[in-house]
Amino acid sequence: MNPVEDFTKLNLFGTFTNFVSAPVPFDCYHDPTKSETILVADLPGVLPNDMKVNVDKDKLIIQGKRECEKHDYLFSNRWCGSFIHHISFAKEVKASDVNVGLGEGILKITISNTPTNNVIGVKMSNNNKVEF
C-alpha cells in the first residue's frame, strides 16, 4: 500500500484562501525511511504564540494570525490577519504522533502513521529552529 494514498481527501488551499489574500505555500510529503508524513508551510511573521494546531480524529486544524502593520502603503503584497486550515486524512491521527515546530517563518508538522480515536490538542514547540 502506498502511504501517500492516505491523503486522498487532502485539501490544502481551500480554507487558507478564504482568510488570506494570497495562497499560503504549503507542501505535504511522505518520508518512507521514517514512516512519517510531513507538512511544511511558509508563514513569515507568524509567532508561535499566535499559532494553534489541533488534532480532531482524522483532521488536523491549523489556525493562527499575523498582525497587520499600520502604514500608509502605496501597495502591499504581504498577507496579514487570521487564518484557519483544516487538513483531512484518510485515517485517524493520534495527537501524540504529531510534532509541530515553527521557526524562521517555516511551520513544520511531522505525523507518524499510527491510527487512534482520541481528540487531543497539540501545543507548539518553543524551539526557534526547524530541522529538516
UniProtKB/Swiss-Prot annotation:
Q: Which gene encodes it?
A: hspL
Record's keyword annotation contains Hydrolase: no
Give the PROSITE patterns listed for this entry: SHSP
GO terms, biological process: protein complex oligomerization; protein folding; response to heat; response to hydrogen peroxide; response to salt stress
Keywords attached to this Swiss-Prot or TrEMBL record, sorted alphabetically, are:
Stress response
Family classification? Belongs to the small heat shock protein (HSP20) family.
Record GO terms (molecular function): unfolded protein binding
Please state every residue range assigned to the domain named sHSP.
15-131
- Has the keyword Lipoprotein been applied to this entry? no
Protein name per Swiss-Prot or TrEMBL:
Small heat shock protein hspL
